[in-house]
């Protein structure tokens, strides 16, 4: 519940028994996520989503030993809904709460088992390229809890650049997947943009976004 998706999963001994996601189509008309609408949708969705996750897992809520929740980063209103629900659920069942950094969860989600026979385990240390809607980072992962950001965007995240470019082209939200699909069908050598020179492991997408907007403006004039 960090942004516009309400999600719940049931995990036993590292094996995922269920995973339910409810996406919010209400933001499409606005070309981006509206925080207030996202918060309201989370309030409507969170109980049905959690109930469905328990149902698919074949687990009763009384059997739960703990409840994990997203503490951030994310939209404040969305985070408050998830946190408040987790606190109430924890108190009612008398079970502990586990707060989770959702970016760390992105890194470690690849190692959640889907069956008892899945023995895939992380080989620490390793490097992770984390690219999500609002974040773009290079992370050195030393252990489950020890992670070090060694590089990141100094301006826009890759997802933000995708969505902003998609919006000016009149593509529906979210535009990233649509641009990705169209790019695979197009000519990769049709246009060339200058690549920013950033020291170290950091990177920048704002210049690339601006170059694209100028190109689009000039093409429209023609």
In which residue ranges do the predicted regions lie?
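N-terminal beta-alpha supersecondary unit
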Residues: 1-73, 102, 106
């Amino acid at each position: 519940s960090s942004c516009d998706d309400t999600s719940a999963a049931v995990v036993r001994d590292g094996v995922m028994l269920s995973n339910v996601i409810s996406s919010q189509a209400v933001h499409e008309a606005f070309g981006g996520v509206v925080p207030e609408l996202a918060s309201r949708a989370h309030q409507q969705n969170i109980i049905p989503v959690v109930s469905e996750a328990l149902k698919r897992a074949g687990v009763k809520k009384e059997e739960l030993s703990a409840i994990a929740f997203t503490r951030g980063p994310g939209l404040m209103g969305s985070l408050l809904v998830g946190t408040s629900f987790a606190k109430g659920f924890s108190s009612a069942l008398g079970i502990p709460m586990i707060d989770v950094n959702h970016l760390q969860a992105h890194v470690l989600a690849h190692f959640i088992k889907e069956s008892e026979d899945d023995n895939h385990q992380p080989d620490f240390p390793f490097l992770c390229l984390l690219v999500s809607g609002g974040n773009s980072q290079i992370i050195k992962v030393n252990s489950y809890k020890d992670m070090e950001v060694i590089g990141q965007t100094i301006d826009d995240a890759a997802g933000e650049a995708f969505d902003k470019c998609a919006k000016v082209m009149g593509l529906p939200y979210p535009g990233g997947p649509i641009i990705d699909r169209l790019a695979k069908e197009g000519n990769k050598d049709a246009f060339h943009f200058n690549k920013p020179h950033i020291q170290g492991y950091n990177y920048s997408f704002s210049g690339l976004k601006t170059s694209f907007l100028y190109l689009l403006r000039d093409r429209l004039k023609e």
